[in-house]
């Protein structure tokens, strides 16, 4: 007793430790179904110095269980101390029957007979003994009893723990209070880190707070309102998006930030990384790679020579058609040039004058090539007629022309000051008989632009049509009637007939080597007023868009045929004196001979429109020219008729308006 008290008074002794931790060195195994009770007991046992084991073994000191069998621990110990009836088969003896001992002495033969002589009652007794066993085999309780582990019910364990806790509290109250002096906290050692300049560092003098630092890619200038960052701000960055957390605590506190810049804006280098398929290499910056010599050498090399060769073979140049949106302005007789078969030969002094019709009411004339010796032919002396003042001398409409025709543009005709007349210039010749089989063969027609500085034409007798230089053969075929206009024509001694000065709407229709035998009267067709009613069966030739420009296009534009269409317009009042050219080689009704009409009025019927209020929209005709071919059996009347029709190119009838080339 004295030793116990002395041990309690001595705070530094081992007995004092046993009082504070009564479960020190004890192992507990909890066999509980309630989780809450198990956690509470585990906490109390650890406070008292005990330990919890997760597996049942012979080292366990106490087994705490919630089973009912744990309440009668003494009875369980008594039952377990009785030898098991199953031990008899192992020893070869039966503990229930004394007669079996006698049989054991008799030998093995008697043992076999005993096993076979077991009665039914004995087997029932054995079964009853097994059923009376309280603890099943290999259970937690049976194993704990066999290993000598102390078994406690959960209620008994709670009462025992509470008892130990109260005893511990009494011991703590009896002990004097000992004040423990708090030692100053030792400064935490931090591994030094080297900062890369430029940087900003804020350090506490007392060293109680860790320093704040910020490493900058480029030191900021306080004089400029805008930061001199080498990295541009990403405009797509969300202003509310926060910067990722880093070791730099200044991002959290906001110290050291420039007030002019938003710290929430994400900085991003504006560099586009990618792969160049031409150079077969990766690049970090697109702009610098494009300017690199390797990329330039590839773009300037001969890799694209095949593409350039293909583009150079195209017939058309790339023209921006959006500049020419006004498609309502008409054009006169536009004859496209056919490409020459023999390249390199210069085509000299061959012109096709085209007048730009103002509100579709200007006069239109055409010119064809003339052989050099045509003017010297006595049978080909043409008559000259002055042009009507209704014609306009506006700038000509320019069209693509073959190679060599650019030299013929903007050419002035030499005017005779004494007579005020234009001298016809010899032009390249062509064989009319060889070219009447459907086309003009190798003829070349060019579009020339009249010079704006051309002198005005001398006034003469006015007439409603502009055709001059009519072949003498046609004038011979027409009934001979004195024409007052022909009296104003001046002939030179050499027999050449000259027209008065030409304007933009005047041209000459010239023939070569007309057969002198064709002296008979030709039946001229009647005014054509129903040509477009028979357009359904005719094929449509390719029409090229009109380029309304005063500049000349490249001279490799294709050749083609035109068509004209007349459309009635109720919104415009046309002057009846203004004529509309409607050319067609197919005339429905031939005109009867009338001696009372002048030759000019007879030819005027070819170009006269069927309606007064019409708009000029292009030519209309048949592509077939087989009927125009000259046969040996044709009469002179038919021969001259075919020659007249062959002057005009192949035309087609189309429902669409004339758009140009």
Curated annotation (Swiss-Prot):
Residues 18-111, 136-161 form the BRCT domain. It holds the Pfam family zf-DBF. Forms a complex with cdc7. Signal peptide: none annotated. Regulatory subunit for cdc7 which activates its kinase activity thereby playing a central role in DNA replication and cell proliferation. Not required during the initiation of DNA replication in egg and during early embryonic development but is required later and throughout development. The complex cdc7-dbf4a phosphorylates mcm2 subunit. Keywords: Cell cycle, Metal-binding, Nucleus, Phosphoprotein, Repeat, Zinc, Zinc-finger. Phosphorylated. Residues 86-119, 234-266 are annotated as: Disordered. GO terms for cellular component: Dbf4-dependent protein kinase complex. It comes from Xenopus laevis (African clawed frog). Its main location: nucleus. Transmembrane segments: none annotated. This is Protein DBF4 homolog A. A zinc finger (DBF4-type) spans 269-317.
